[in-house]
Amino acid sequence: MAIKTYKPTSAGRRHQTCSAFDEITTSTPEKSLIVTIKKTGGRNSFGRITARHIGGGHKKKYRIIDFRRNKVEVPAKVASIEYDPNRSARIALLHYADGAKRYILAPLDLKVGDSIVASSNADIKPGNALPLRAIPLGTIIHNIELKIGKGGQLARSAGTFAQLMAKEGKYAQVKLPSGEVRMVLLDCMATIGQVGNIDHENVSIGKAGRSRWLGRRPKVRGVAMNPVDHPHGGGEGRTSGGRHPVTPWGIPTKGYKTRKNKTSTRFIVKKRSK
């Protein structure tokens, strides 16, 4: 994937970059695999904001992605590589030998016409899905399950990957993109390769309006608010907030650890480094 730059015809264009979309082969999604999604504006069923800075954005149709890869032993051909407005990665449309059609996350180097399969004895090549027990140590993987049959939950963003480090008992040790090493059951599925669109991290939004197209609303600083809205608010003239940085709810931020101990903590072999 290449990054497209623009001539500085305006202040917003000057530093703006975007994907060249070279790998996209069609602009029309598969109709049977799209559904309408309703916008929430970050509100819950009571109408209260539960996720800040969400709202607006271009209208989108949701593409149903096969994260489970549970169509085993049935070979499929890659029919197209498509843009998905709901995620940073590209998606690949698969045509299975039995006539079924499904979308998967498009790994790096997957091309139209390639044949892939989900099987415990599949080849170790990008796009093939196998249980962790059948994958050799050191292999680059993505779309990793945490619970058997639930579908991939780890390493799904553009350019991300994990690495299989060890196998011990009924668990595999997987190094995640954050640097964390975690134990995952050997019967959990994972897909071979790195997620495509690896230059996504180099894209510069360029202007505020483009963030609004993506459904992201402005983030207002606490010190710019009134005391009723934020612990840092108020004061005569510009102030520093007058205390150590906190969230709008008074919880210390900027380095303060907020993760609670939970059942899954025992599966973490090494804490994240990022």
Swiss-Prot record:
One of its GO terms (cellular component) is cytosolic large ribosomal subunit. Residues 223-257 are annotated as: Disordered. It comes from the Bacteria. Keywords: Ribonucleoprotein, Ribosomal protein, RNA-binding, rRNA-binding. GO terms for molecular function: RNA binding; rRNA binding; structural constituent of ribosome; transferase activity. The keyword Plastid does not apply. GO terms for biological process: cytoplasmic translation. Pfam families: Ribosomal_L2, Ribosomal_L2_C. SUPFAM superfamilies: Nucleic acid-binding proteins, Translation proteins SH3-like domain. Part of the 50S ribosomal subunit. Forms a bridge to the 30S subunit in the 70S ribosome. One of the primary rRNA binding proteins. Required for association of the 30S and 50S subunits to form the 70S ribosome, for tRNA binding and peptide bond formation. It has been suggested to have peptidyltransferase activity; this is somewhat controversial. Makes several contacts with the 16S rRNA in the 70S ribosome. Belongs to the universal ribosomal protein uL2 family. This is Large ribosomal subunit protein uL2. It comes from Geobacter sulfurreducens (strain ATCC 51573 / DSM 12127 / PCA). The gene is rplB.
